[in-house]
């Protein structure tokens, strides 16, 4: 199972977590990892949900820097601006706080199958998603500060 997530902050608004899960089931031709199109679709969904331009600060995952992804970013420069975190700096990424909370919530969990794992993971992420103070804390722990433009 792979998860991609965006932790969204805007001064004066409730913090948001937007995510997608890919459960690998071993089907012929099925990708085990999230592809650049999965990330593209996540960005499009975020743009629709948030209803405004996005300034994205991304880690240096190779799929984030693939030529088709870069083309998508360039084509949507009217609503999408992308910066990258410095290399090897997970401590600056608020999403890492989300993954840490998720992992802690699943510490003693033993899934019976992939569907059970996906359902439980979604339930745990929804619990985080609906508690904006938890999402806010992920930004606070990075030491980064939001400044209104």
Which functions belong to the PLM regions below?
Residues 1-149:
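Short functional hotspots at interaction and active-site rims
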């Amino acid at each position: 199972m792979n998860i991609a997530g965006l932790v969204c902050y805007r001064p004066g608004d409730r913090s948001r977590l937007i995510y997608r899960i890919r459960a690998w089931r071993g089907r012929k031709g099925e990708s085990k990892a999230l592809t650049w199109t999965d990330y593209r679709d996540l960005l499009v969904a975020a743009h629709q949900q948030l209803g405004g331009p996005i300034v994205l600060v991304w880690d240096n995952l190779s799929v984030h820097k693939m030529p088709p992804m870069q083309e998508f970013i360039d084509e949507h420069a009217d609503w999408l601006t992308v910066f990258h975190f410095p290399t090897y700096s997970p401590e600056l990424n608020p999403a890492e706080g989300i993954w840490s909370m998720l992992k802690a919530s699943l510490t003693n969990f033993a899934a019976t199958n992939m569907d059970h794992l996906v359902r439980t993971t979604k339930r745990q992420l929804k619990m985080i998603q609906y508690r904006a103070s938890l999402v806010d804390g992920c930004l606070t722990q990075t030491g980064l500060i939001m400044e209104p433009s």
